[in-house]
Amino acid sequence: MKIDLTALVTESRNKASENIDVLSTVEMLTVINQEDQKVALAVEAILPQIADVVDAIAVAFQSGGRLIYTGAGTSGRLGILDASECPPTYGSNPDLVVGLIAGGHKAILKAVENAEDNRELGASDLQDLGLNEKDVLVGIAASGRTPYVLGAMEYAKSVGATVATLSCNPNSPMTELADINMTPVVGPEVVTGSSRMKAGTAQKLVLNMLTTGAMIRTGKVFGNLMVDVEATNAKLVQRQKNIVIEATGCSEVEASEALSQCDNHCKTAILMVLSGLDAQSAKAKLAQHNGFIRNALSDQ
């Protein structure tokens, strides 16, 4: 079956880079850099739609639902990257944000032939994951037409999940299936069709916003501090101490003592120092207020 890609913005030729192969290295990189500067503006143009998805994800998290990313190639890898960073950054369950890629784990490192063209695989991967009406699915594809993602979106709609798209081509087949469309139109790529470049950068910026925004909305950030960070290495042990110090103004000794008394739960240590509660009482108070430090502090 012949596929017509000529109408896709991401497949168009970029006039600014038509002679990039004869430029000096600095000139070549200047063209790339100038094109990259358009990406943040394209994302800015869709902030209201991104906000709608963030709010939907926050509701899902608070209702026992999950955020599921699905994509092929670069798009799938970006979803997996974003999902994998949530547990160490926010202390979230690894099952809370999940990234799926056409072709499975082996496709993370190496392309799997024809996997992205398998519409049924997109659906069955979600079925295996037990997708349900509490979940939010974000279908990621620069083209907006990847069969694997379309199959996943159709299945998600059939079970009542909230469905959003992240693509870089307006009026794509994916937009017809979604409840919320996020379409940062970044224009033609420097290398024609290489959507890992501007489109991929736009996708990464949006994914950062989705999980960061949802985690803030569910109490995992106090001020601008990642108060649910887990101390899984030496750097993060020190970061926990620094966060407690920044949040409370206490000494390093006081921060260390508080953390040691609450099994290194950063959020609990902060509440202990600020409220004078012991570890057990601070944990209970946080649980009472769904992990929101500000709400726990106001209930004194």
Swiss-Prot record:
Its EC number is 4.2.1.126. Pathway: Amino-sugar metabolism; 1,6-anhydro-N-acetylmuramate degradation; Amino-sugar metabolism; N-acetylmuramate degradation; Cell wall biogenesis; peptidoglycan recycling. It comes from the Bacteria. The active site is at E85, E116. It catalyses: N-acetyl-D-muramate 6-phosphate + H2O = N-acetyl-D-glucosamine 6-phosphate + (R)-lactate. InterPro entries: Etherase_MurQ, Glucokinase_regulatory_CS, MURQ/GCKR, SIS_dom, SIS_dom_sf. The keyword Repeat does not apply. GO terms for molecular function: carbohydrate derivative binding; carbon-oxygen lyase activity; ether hydrolase activity. CDD domains: SIS_Etherase (cd05007). Coiled coil: none annotated. Keywords: Carbohydrate metabolism, Lyase. GO terms for biological process: 1,6-anhydro-N-acetyl-beta-muramic acid catabolic process; amino sugar catabolic process; N-acetylmuramic acid catabolic process; peptidoglycan turnover. Residues 57-220 form the SIS domain. Belongs to the GCKR-like family. MurNAc-6-P etherase subfamily. NCBIfam families: N-acetylmuramic acid 6-phosphate etherase, PRK05441.1, PRK12570.1. Homodimer. A lyase-type mechanism (elimination/hydration) is suggested for the cleavage of the lactyl ether bond of MurNAc 6-phosphate, with the formation of an alpha,beta-unsaturated aldehyde intermediate with (E)-stereochemistry, followed by the syn addition of water to give product. PANTHER family: GLUCOKINASE REGULATORY PROTEIN. Specifically catalyzes the cleavage of the D-lactyl ether substituent of MurNAc 6-phosphate, producing GlcNAc 6-phosphate and D-lactate. Together with AnmK, is also required for the utilization of anhydro-N-acetylmuramic acid (anhMurNAc) either imported from the medium or derived from its own cell wall murein, and thus plays a role in cell wall recycling. This is N-acetylmuramic acid 6-phosphate etherase. It comes from Aliivibrio fischeri (strain MJ11). The gene is murQ.
